[in-house]
């Protein structure tokens, strides 16, 4: 808000599932799973690398997921619809934090290359704000450019 981060959704701990992360989970079921004889490392591996879309479809490649959806694979369609729903819900929650005074909703990373995926999310959230698509991976470049600005004295390091 006004150029500052006011809230985040840490994909390692909460929010929508990802390609290999579980996202937010029902607490009671999670507790039961944790006490089902699994070690701590097994539980962490399951929810941190073998969950999300991977747990349904055996892949972390979103292009493969989309191909299965286009082919009409029922399991892929169901998992895909759950992902879209969860992401739309998270976008709506973040819009609420901003009192729905949102300048834009930005779709980034590799998933933003898929037209129908962006269209499906936009069907839920498109009335909130204009949609901007910036497909591709820019995280490392952005981090490097930010660090360079700090090292050159052009910007102070931010603490979060």
Descriptions of predicted regions:
Residues 6-60:
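Glycine-rich phosphate-binding loop plus the immediately following alpha-helix
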Residues 27-35, 41-48, 63-66, 88, ...:
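Predominant activation on well-ordered alpha-helical scaffold segments within soluble catalytic domains
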Residues 45-100:
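Adenine-nucleotide phosphate-binding core of ATP-dependent small-molecule kinases
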Residues 102-121:
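Glycine-rich phosphate-binding loops at beta-strand->alpha-helix junctions
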Residues 9, 106-109, 135:
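Active-site proximal loops enriched in glycine and acidic residues that flank catalytic Cys/His/Asp
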Residues 112-113, 119, 130-160:
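Glycine-rich phosphate-binding/hydrolytic loop that grips phosphoryl groups
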Residues 2-6, 11-13, 120-128, 154-156:
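A glycine- and small-aliphatic-rich helix-loop capping segment at beta-alpha/alpha-beta transitions
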């Amino acid at each position: 808000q006004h150029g500052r981060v006011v809230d985040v959704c840490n994909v390692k701990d909460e929010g929508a599932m990802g390609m290999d992360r579980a996202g937010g989970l029902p607490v009671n079921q999670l507790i039961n799973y944790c006490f089902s004889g699994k070690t701590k490392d097994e539980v962490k591996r399951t929810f941190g690398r073998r969950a999300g879309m991977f747990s349904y479809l055996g892949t972390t490649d979103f292009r493969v997921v989309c191909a299965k959806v286009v082919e009409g694979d029922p399991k892929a369609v169901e998992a895909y619809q759950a992902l879209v729903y969860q992401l739309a819900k998270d976008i709506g929650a973040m819009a609420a934090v901003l009192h729905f005074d949102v300048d834009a909703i930005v779709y980034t990373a590799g998933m933003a290359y898929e037209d129908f995926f962006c269209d499906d999310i936009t069907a839920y959230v498109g009335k909130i704000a204009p949609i901007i698509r910036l497909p591709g991976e820019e995280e490392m470049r952005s981090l490097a450019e930010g660090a360079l600005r700090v090292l050159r004295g052009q910007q102070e390091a931010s603490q979060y």
